[in-house]
């Protein structure tokens, strides 16, 4: 699962579109599948992080996430890209669910790391698959966007409450 990262407000990282490559063997295939105008500049010496486009991606990020501002208002948002065709060809169609399990595990790590850093993360369940693929230049099914996530400062919503689950747990206030 590779991460297409839309960086908005990260200290020492210029805004833009990045790709965190989780499998170095996929680099050539991803480069060939993505837009030819991407830079593919190494963005970090310690991570397989590639700067694709040094541009303001806030409005694009929100648009791709069903026009949800949460994708643009945080530090960054990301789309998880599965090595789709190769996985299904190697392991069969039933492997599809394993790809989603992997996105869930990556999401859980992001939740935990965000909390440990004193910020918040949340999954973004609504995103437009085809426009995400178009933004990256992906036109075949080799790589597919399966899940999105964002990290930023928490926004408390007074409409959300926590109530006891059982009547005997309720106390008079």
Locate predicted features:
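Acidic, surface-exposed loops and disordered segments
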Residues: 1-173
């Amino acid at each position: 699962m590779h991460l297409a990262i839309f960086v908005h407000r990260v200290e020492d990282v210029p805004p833009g579109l990045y790709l965190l490559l989780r499998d170095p063997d996929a680099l050539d295939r991803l480069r060939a599948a993505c837009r030819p105008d991407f830079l593919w500049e190494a963005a970090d010496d310690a991570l397989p992080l590639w700067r694709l486009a040094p541009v303001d991606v806030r409005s694009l990020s929100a648009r791709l996430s069903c026009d949800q501002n949460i994708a643009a208002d945080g530090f960054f948002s990301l789309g998880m890209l599965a090595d789709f065709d190769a996985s299904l060809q190697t392991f069969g169609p039933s492997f599809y669910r394993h790809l989603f399990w992997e996105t869930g595990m990556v999401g859980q790590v992001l939740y935990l790391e965000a909390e440990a850093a004193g910020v918040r993360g949340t999954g973004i369940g609504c995103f437009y698959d085809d426009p995400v693929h178009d933004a990256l230049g992906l036109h075949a099914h080799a790589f597919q966007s399966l899940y999105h996530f964002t990290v930023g400062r928490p926004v408390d919503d007074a409409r959300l409450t926590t109530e006891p689950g059982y009547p005997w747990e309720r106390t008079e206030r």
